Amino acid sequence: VSEEYEKNTLIKLSKMGSSSKLCLYGKLKNNCQSEEYLNCNNFIHRQLLSKFRLSDHSLGIELGRYRNIPRAQRLCKKCEVLDDEYHFFLYCDINISLRSNLFAYLKDYVPLFQHLDAFNKLKHILNPIPELVCHIGVFIKQSLELRESDPCQARL
C-alpha cells in the first residue's frame, strides 16, 4: 500500500504545471522520504528552507499570485526580471556578495557545482546535505534582510 501511495504521489508531483504553486517542489521531490535538512537543529534554517521549497515566501512570484498579478509581471524590483526562486538564489543583484560566499562553500561539497545548470544548482541548494543547511539558511535569512532594507524592493 505505501509503495503504491508513494508512486502515485510522485507521479502527481511530477505532473504539476509551471503555474502551480507546488511546481518547484514537484521538481525537487523525487521520493517520499523525509529530507535530511529536517534534521538540522536550527529551527530558523529548517523553516526558511521549507518555505522556499514549498513556495511559501515573500518573492514576487508568490506575492503576485495572491494579488492576481500576471506571472510575467511578478518582477524583482531591483533587477526587473521574474522574481522567482531561481532569480533569488542564482541571479539577483541584491545578494551578489552573499551568493559568492555561498557558492564558494558549496563547491567544496558539490563537485563541479559552478558547472551545473540552473535547475541542478537550485536543487543542491534546496535539497542540501546536512553540512550545508546552516550556510544556506544564513544565505536566505541575510538575503531576505537585504531585500527588506533595499528601497528598490519596496512593495506596493
Predicted regions and their residues:
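Negatively charged
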Residues: 1
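Family-specific functional microsites
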Residues: 6-156
